[in-house]
Protein backbone atom coordinates (compact mmCIF):
# COMPACT_ATOMS: atom_id res chain seq x y z
CA UNK A 1 0.00 0.00 0.00
CA UNK A 2 1.33 3.44 -0.98
CA UNK A 3 1.34 6.19 1.63
CA UNK A 4 -0.62 9.09 0.04
CA UNK A 5 -0.18 11.58 2.92
CA UNK A 6 2.59 13.64 1.22
CA UNK A 7 0.38 14.01 -1.89
CA UNK A 8 -2.61 15.09 0.21
CA UNK A 9 -0.40 17.63 1.94
CA UNK A 10 0.79 19.01 -1.42
CA UNK A 11 -2.79 19.24 -2.70
CA UNK A 12 -3.70 21.19 0.41
CA UNK A 13 -0.64 23.48 0.34
CA UNK A 14 -0.94 24.67 -3.27
CA UNK A 15 -4.32 26.42 -2.85
CA UNK A 16 -3.14 27.92 0.45
CA UNK A 17 0.03 29.24 -1.21
CA UNK A 18 -2.00 30.68 -4.08
CA UNK A 19 -4.36 32.48 -1.68
CA UNK A 20 -1.42 33.89 0.25
CA UNK A 21 0.25 35.23 -2.90
CA UNK A 22 -2.99 36.77 -4.18
CA UNK A 23 -3.54 38.41 -0.81
CA UNK A 24 -0.07 39.93 -0.93
CA UNK A 25 -0.64 41.40 -4.38
CA UNK A 26 -3.90 43.00 -3.24
CA UNK A 27 -2.23 44.37 -0.13
CA UNK A 28 0.61 45.83 -2.19
CA UNK A 29 -1.96 47.51 -4.45
CA UNK A 30 -2.87 49.83 -1.58
CA UNK A 31 0.42 51.71 -1.92
CA UNK A 32 1.00 51.48 -5.65
CA UNK A 33 -0.05 54.17 -8.07
CA UNK A 34 -3.67 54.00 -9.09
CA UNK A 35 -4.19 54.45 -12.84
CA UNK A 36 -7.96 53.93 -12.69
CA UNK A 37 -7.92 50.57 -14.48
CA UNK A 38 -9.89 47.52 -13.42
CA UNK A 39 -12.82 48.56 -11.24
CA UNK A 40 -11.90 51.99 -9.84
CA UNK A 41 -15.48 52.51 -8.63
CA UNK A 42 -14.76 49.83 -6.01
CA UNK A 43 -11.68 51.72 -4.74
CA UNK A 44 -12.71 55.36 -4.93
CA UNK A 45 -15.54 57.04 -3.02
CA UNK A 46 -17.21 60.40 -3.76
CA UNK A 47 -18.16 62.65 -0.81
CA UNK A 48 -19.63 66.15 -0.53
CA UNK A 49 -20.10 68.57 2.34
CA UNK A 50 -23.73 67.39 2.51
CA UNK A 51 -22.53 64.86 5.10
CA UNK A 52 -22.24 67.85 7.47
CA UNK A 53 -25.15 70.01 6.28
CA UNK A 54 -23.48 71.72 3.31
CA UNK A 55 -25.11 72.18 -0.09
CA UNK A 56 -22.28 71.44 -2.55
CA UNK A 57 -23.20 69.03 -5.34
CA UNK A 58 -21.28 66.99 -7.85
CA UNK A 59 -20.45 63.60 -9.24
CA UNK A 60 -17.58 61.29 -10.04
CA UNK A 61 -17.31 59.36 -13.30
CA UNK A 62 -14.70 56.95 -14.53
CA UNK A 63 -13.89 57.47 -18.20
CA UNK A 64 -11.41 56.44 -20.88
CA UNK A 65 -10.17 58.50 -23.80
CA UNK A 66 -7.41 57.56 -26.24
CA UNK A 67 -6.38 54.53 -24.15
CA UNK A 68 -6.11 56.59 -20.96
CA UNK A 69 -8.37 55.83 -18.00
CA UNK A 70 -9.20 58.59 -15.57
CA UNK A 71 -11.56 59.75 -12.85
CA UNK A 72 -13.47 62.96 -13.55
CA UNK A 73 -15.05 64.94 -10.74
CA UNK A 74 -17.42 67.77 -11.60
CA UNK A 75 -19.70 69.85 -9.44
CA UNK A 76 -20.66 73.05 -7.73
CA UNK A 77 -18.77 73.90 -4.54
CA UNK A 78 -20.76 76.15 -2.21
CA UNK A 79 -19.71 77.62 1.13
CA UNK A 80 -23.34 78.05 2.25
CA UNK A 81 -24.29 76.32 5.53
CA UNK A 82 -20.61 76.14 6.59
CA UNK A 83 -19.85 73.80 3.70
CA UNK A 84 -17.46 74.09 0.82
CA UNK A 85 -16.11 70.83 -0.58
CA UNK A 86 -16.54 67.90 -2.91
CA UNK A 87 -13.95 65.15 -3.07
CA UNK A 88 -13.08 61.65 -4.13
CA UNK A 89 -10.79 59.47 -2.06
CA UNK A 90 -9.49 55.97 -1.59
CA UNK A 91 -7.62 54.01 1.00
CA UNK A 92 -3.97 54.11 0.08
CA UNK A 93 -0.74 53.81 2.03
CA UNK A 94 2.72 55.13 1.27
CA UNK A 95 5.76 52.98 1.83
CA UNK A 96 8.64 54.08 4.04
CA UNK A 97 11.01 56.12 1.97
CA UNK A 98 8.25 57.78 -0.08
CA UNK A 99 8.85 61.50 -0.51
CA UNK A 100 5.47 62.81 -1.59
CA UNK A 101 2.32 62.52 -3.68
CA UNK A 102 2.37 62.24 -7.46
CA UNK A 103 -0.74 62.88 -9.56
CA UNK A 104 -1.45 63.31 -13.27
CA UNK A 105 -4.25 65.83 -13.78
CA UNK A 106 -6.01 68.26 -16.03
CA UNK A 107 -8.81 70.62 -15.12
CA UNK A 108 -10.60 73.88 -15.61
CA UNK A 109 -7.85 76.19 -14.34
CA UNK A 110 -9.01 76.14 -10.72
CA UNK A 111 -6.93 75.39 -7.64
CA UNK A 112 -7.52 71.95 -6.10
CA UNK A 113 -6.14 70.09 -3.12
CA UNK A 114 -4.74 66.73 -2.14
CA UNK A 115 -5.91 65.63 1.31
CA UNK A 116 -4.08 62.90 3.20
CA UNK A 117 -5.54 61.13 6.19
CA UNK A 118 -3.22 59.31 8.55
CA UNK A 119 -3.47 57.10 11.60
CA UNK A 120 -3.33 60.39 13.57
CA UNK A 121 -6.30 62.05 11.82
CA UNK A 122 -9.05 60.48 13.89
CA UNK A 123 -11.73 63.18 13.62
CA UNK A 124 -13.63 63.54 10.31
CA UNK A 125 -12.43 67.12 9.78
CA UNK A 126 -8.74 66.34 10.26
CA UNK A 127 -6.40 65.95 7.29
CA UNK A 128 -3.14 67.14 5.78
CA UNK A 129 -3.57 69.41 2.76
CA UNK A 130 -1.52 70.69 -0.18
CA UNK A 131 -2.81 72.69 -3.15
CA UNK A 132 -2.11 72.44 -6.86
CA UNK A 133 -3.28 74.30 -9.96
CA UNK A 134 -4.75 72.76 -13.09
CA UNK A 135 -4.76 73.62 -16.78
CA UNK A 136 -6.66 72.10 -19.68
CA UNK A 137 -3.56 70.04 -20.56
CA UNK A 138 -2.51 66.85 -18.80
CA UNK A 139 0.40 67.41 -16.43
CA UNK A 140 2.17 65.40 -13.74
CA UNK A 141 2.45 67.10 -10.37
CA UNK A 142 4.73 66.05 -7.52
CA UNK A 143 4.01 67.42 -4.05
CA UNK A 144 6.60 66.67 -1.36
CA UNK A 145 5.21 65.60 2.02
CA UNK A 146 6.89 68.66 3.60
CA UNK A 147 4.41 70.86 1.65
CA UNK A 148 1.38 69.32 3.38
CA UNK A 149 -0.13 71.31 6.24
CA UNK A 150 -2.29 69.83 8.99
CA UNK A 151 -5.86 71.07 9.36
CA UNK A 152 -5.46 71.57 13.12
CA UNK A 153 -2.79 72.23 15.73
CA UNK A 154 -3.54 68.81 17.24
CA UNK A 155 -1.88 67.06 14.31
CA UNK A 156 1.80 66.27 14.06
CA UNK A 157 3.65 68.90 12.07
CA UNK A 158 5.01 66.44 9.49
CA UNK A 159 3.35 63.66 7.52
CA UNK A 160 4.90 60.26 8.21
CA UNK A 161 4.55 58.11 5.05
CA UNK A 162 3.85 54.81 6.87
CA UNK A 163 0.99 56.48 8.78
CA UNK A 164 -0.93 57.49 5.61
CA UNK A 165 -4.29 55.74 5.31
CA UNK A 166 -6.03 57.54 2.42
CA UNK A 167 -5.56 60.05 -0.38
CA UNK A 168 -8.26 62.43 -1.61
CA UNK A 169 -8.60 64.89 -4.49
CA UNK A 170 -10.63 67.85 -3.25
CA UNK A 171 -12.37 70.96 -4.59
CA UNK A 172 -12.49 73.09 -1.47
CA UNK A 173 -12.91 76.34 0.38
CA UNK A 174 -14.62 78.77 -1.99
CA UNK A 175 -17.66 79.00 -4.26
CA UNK A 176 -16.69 77.65 -7.68
CA UNK A 177 -17.37 75.11 -10.42
CA UNK A 178 -15.16 72.05 -10.18
CA UNK A 179 -14.05 70.02 -13.18
CA UNK A 180 -10.94 67.91 -12.66
CA UNK A 181 -9.69 64.70 -14.27
CA UNK A 182 -7.04 62.49 -12.65
CA UNK A 183 -5.38 59.67 -14.60
CA UNK A 184 -2.86 58.63 -11.93
CA UNK A 185 -2.58 59.09 -8.17
CA UNK A 186 0.08 57.67 -5.90
CA UNK A 187 3.37 58.31 -4.19
CA UNK A 188 6.95 58.91 -5.30
Residue ranges and their predicted role:
Residues 1, 18, 151:
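Short regulatory "switch" loops immediately downstream of catalytic or recognition motifs
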Residues 3-14:
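Bacterial N-terminal signal peptides that target proteins for export
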Residues 14-21:
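Bacterial N-terminal signal peptides
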Residues 25-188:
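Beta-rich carbohydrate-recognition modules and glycan-binding surfaces
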